[in-house]
């Protein structure tokens, strides 16, 4: 069986590399299944404290492999909603709910669902040559993989509409200027920069980082009153963590903390 997802765990970081470079790492059903299995390990293994996603070759991910759908213009219409429900919706939900930081290192073109997957990372770093393309409209489709929810939140309504309706390429530099991604780096430094950041996060109080992630995600739809209540509840949980005790102890003793993510 082909390895469409390359998995490597080191120093608390799981690096998952989308590995269909000849197809710009576009998804087929087997690639979806392999990614889902890898995510099970991230969810269950407490020693994995940060997830890094990237792509092999010159692309991050070109979205759905249309060759895998075998659309017959003269045959019955395919049920694309079933594909979304079976593969993309569970993927988006799992990454959003994962109580660990998710870094996306965008090494090249990210198109369609690949673009929304990339932009959905907690921290997104892109190579200078990377491009984001909301290619759905070119095929008569709507952005999925969380695209219609994500785009207005990372780009604002006007830019979200333009990106989704026109399907034009967006450069990494422009995405950074618009505040859609965290950082742009030279192509040759992307892998090292992303790994250094992932390893740093893996040494931090990741129990608290998970709460931060969930709180910020919840703020997108919560009222102020609801969010204040959530902050109270999450701060209570954080204050009971071993990492909080270690952080205070290290601060008072003027030493480097040794966080465990618990």
Curated annotation (Swiss-Prot):
Instruction: Kindly state which reaction or reactions the protein catalyses.
Output: 2-(1,2-epoxy-1,2-dihydrophenyl)acetyl-CoA = 2-oxepin-2(3H)-ylideneacetyl-CoA
One GO term under biological process is: fatty acid beta-oxidation
First-tier enzyme category under EC: isomerase
Which pathway does it serve? Aromatic compound metabolism; phenylacetate degradation
A single Gene Ontology CC term: catalytic complex
Q: Does the keyword Lyase apply?
A: yes
Q: Which InterPro entries match?
A: ClpP/crotonase-like_dom_sf, Enoyl-CoA_hydra/iso, Enoyl-CoA_hydra_C, PaaB1
Gene induction:
Activated by cAMP receptor protein (CRP), integration host factor (IHF) and by phenylacetyl-coenzyme A (PA-CoA) that prevents PaaX from binding its target sequences. Inhibited by PaaX.
Entry EC number(s): 5.3.3.18
According to the UniProt entry, its GO molecular function terms are:
identical protein binding; isomerase activity; lyase activity
| Annotated keywords | Isomerase, Lyase
Q: What happens when the gene is disrupted?
A: Mutants accumulate ring-1,2-dihydroxy-1,2-dihydrophenylacetyl lactone and are unable to use phenylacetate as a carbon source.
Family affiliation: Belongs to the enoyl-CoA hydratase/isomerase family.
- What does the UniProt function comment say about this protein? Catalyzes the reversible conversion of the epoxide to 2-oxepin-2(3H)-ylideneacetyl-CoA (oxepin-CoA).
Q: Under which name does UniProt file this protein?
A: 1,2-epoxyphenylacetyl-CoA isomerase
């Amino acid at each position: 069986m082909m390895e469409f997802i390359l998995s490597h765990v080191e120093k608390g970081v799981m690096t998952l590399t989308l590995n269909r470079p000849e197809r710009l790492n576009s998804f087929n059903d087997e690639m979806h299944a392999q990614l889902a299995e890898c995510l099970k390990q991230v969810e269950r293994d407490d020693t994995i404290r940060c997830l890094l996603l990237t792509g092999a070759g010159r692309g991050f991910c070109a979205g759905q492999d249309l060759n895998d759908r075998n659309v017959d213009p003269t045959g019955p219409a395919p049920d694309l909603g079933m594909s979304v429900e079976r593969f993309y919706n569970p993927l988006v939900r799992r990454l959003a709910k994962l109580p660990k930081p998710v870094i996306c290192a965008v090494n090249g073109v990210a198109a369609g669902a690949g673009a929304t997957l990339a932009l959905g990372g907690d921290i997104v770093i892109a190579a200078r040559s990377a491009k984001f393309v909301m290619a759905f409209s070119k095929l008569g489709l709507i952005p999925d993989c969380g695209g219609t929810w994500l785009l207005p939140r990372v780009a604002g309504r006007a830019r979200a509409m333009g990106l989704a309706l026109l399907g034009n390429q967006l450069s990494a530099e422009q995405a950074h200027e618009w505040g859609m991604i965290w950082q742009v780096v030279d192509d040759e430094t992307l892998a090292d920069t992303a790994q250094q950041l992932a390893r740093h996060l893996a040494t931090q109080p990741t129990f608290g980082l998970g709460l931060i992630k969930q709180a910020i995600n919840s703020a997108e739809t919560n009222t102020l009153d609801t969010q204040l209540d959530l902050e109270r509840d999450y701060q209570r949980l954080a204050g009971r963590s071993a990492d909080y005790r270690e952080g205070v102890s290290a601060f008072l003793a003027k030493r480097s903390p040794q966080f465990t993510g618990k």
